[in-house]
A protein has these predicted regions:
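Active-site HxH/HxHxD metal-binding segment of metal-dependent hydrolases
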Residues: 104-186, 280
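Accessory terminal helices/loops
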Residues: 28, 32-55, 236-312
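N-terminal secretory signal peptides that target proteins for export/translocation
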Residues: 1-9
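Short, hydrophobic/aromatic-rich segments at coil-to-beta transitions
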Residues: 67-73, 179, 186-190
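Metallo-beta-lactamase
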Residues: 95-97, 102-104, 190-195, 199-284
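Hydrophobic/aromatic beta-strand patches that form the interior of the parallel beta-sheet core
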Residues: 71, 133-135, 159, 192, ...
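Conserved beta-strand hairpin/beta-sheet module of binuclear metal-dependent hydrolase folds
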Residues: 60-121, 204-217
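Bacterial N-terminal signal peptides
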Residues: 14-28
Length: 312
């Protein structure tokens, strides 16, 4: 299978404007093997910033096609140190974009244009349009900054940010917390409420790719906990869910750990040349569950090889 990669390139050095390159889509070939990953997320060479951001020429958005229906986008660390990952999942009639990144400016961070052109390629290959749903793994600024780029656009639904709006849109029950299905058309996702990092936090499981998207609740970095009892319950819920389903990777929204076990990059770092791979595995999720259970009702900072628990 030919790997497909889509990137922006600067029009001229030093300008924020970016041109979109669609040269290597190979849509027909990808459609024939739609469920076969084109890349291994654990081996992708992600843009990791620069020692001198003034001189770096990486695109504002790195786009990697995981398979014929799935894209992973990463924001340039020199544009914003958080460098969040965003995820675009496409079904027969609906596409889901998880998060809108850390920068609002559409000239510097042309997220809507990027997503629209990816979807146009898919629509051209399949002969019909899809509706785009824009949702968030949780309500923090580095995950919703570019919402305004999508607001009011045709064939776009922007999901609300607070826990009640999220629960209503996806049909989630709050007492007790239960997951719900979300149909994209031939691709049914499972949405799990996982409060703790933030009240509106959700996880998304995609049986097509067997990826479990966990936002800022589980990722290779500093796991900031706002509500400790809720976080403990959510981690346990994730483990129970993942045990019942085939999970290839646990995929969060940031990378803050280095490849040196237990060593993270400081907050604000714009150059991470030795960063940890994006995906975690079930073993990492189980270790996190054991750690929070061992802490019981007394939250404390704990350092693991692949993550750091940071109660607030």
């Amino acid at each position: 299978m030919r790997t497909t990669r889509v990137t922006y390139r600067p029009l001229l050095p030093g300008l924020a404007g970016l041109a979109f390159a669609l040269g290597a889509f190979a849509l027909g070939a990808c459609t024939a093997v739609r469920n076969r990953p084109a890349v291994d997320l654990a081996r992708v060479a992600w843009q990791h910033g620069a020692a001198d951001c003034a001189g770096q020429t990486d695109p504002a958005i790195q786009v990697v096609r995981y398979d014929a229906q799935t894209w992973v986008l990463r924001q340039n660390k020199c544009l914003h140190y958080e460098a969040p990952f965003l995820f675009l999942l496409v079904g027969e009639h609906t596409a889901l974009l998880l998060d809108t990144g850390a920068t609002a400016d559409s000239a510097a961070f042309p997220l809507y244009r990027t997503v629209r052109q990816l979807l146009q390629g898919w629509e051209t290959a399949h002969g019909h349009p899809v509706e785009l749903v824009v949702a968030h793994t949780h309500d923090h600024g580095d995950h919703r900054a570019a919402d305004a780029q999508f607001r009011g656009r045709p064939h776009v639904r922007l999901v609300g940010l607070d826990a009640g709006q999220v629960q209503q849109f996806f049909g989630l029950r709050s007492k007790p917390l239960q997951s719900a299905g979300f149909e994209l058309g031939g691709r049914r996702l499972e949405i799990l409420p996982i409060p703790g990092h933030q009240a509106a936090s959700i996880a998304v499981y995609d049986p097509t790719t067997r990826l479990l998207f966990t936002g800022d609740t589980v990722y290779p970095g500093r796991l900031y906990v706002q509500d400790w009892p809720a976080f403990r319950a959510s981690v346990q819920r994730l483990v129970a869910f993942a045990t019942r389903h085939h999970v290839a990777y646990v995929v969060g929204n940031h990378v803050e750990m280095s490849r040196t076990p237990g060593v993270d990059y400081p907050t604000g770092t714009t150059f991470q040349p030795n960063e940890h791979p994006l995906p975690l595995r079930m073993a990492d999720l189980r270790r996190l569950n054991r750690a929070v259970r061992a802490l019981g009702a007394h939250p404390a900072r704990r350092v693991d090889d692949a993550f750091i628990i940071v109660p607030r």
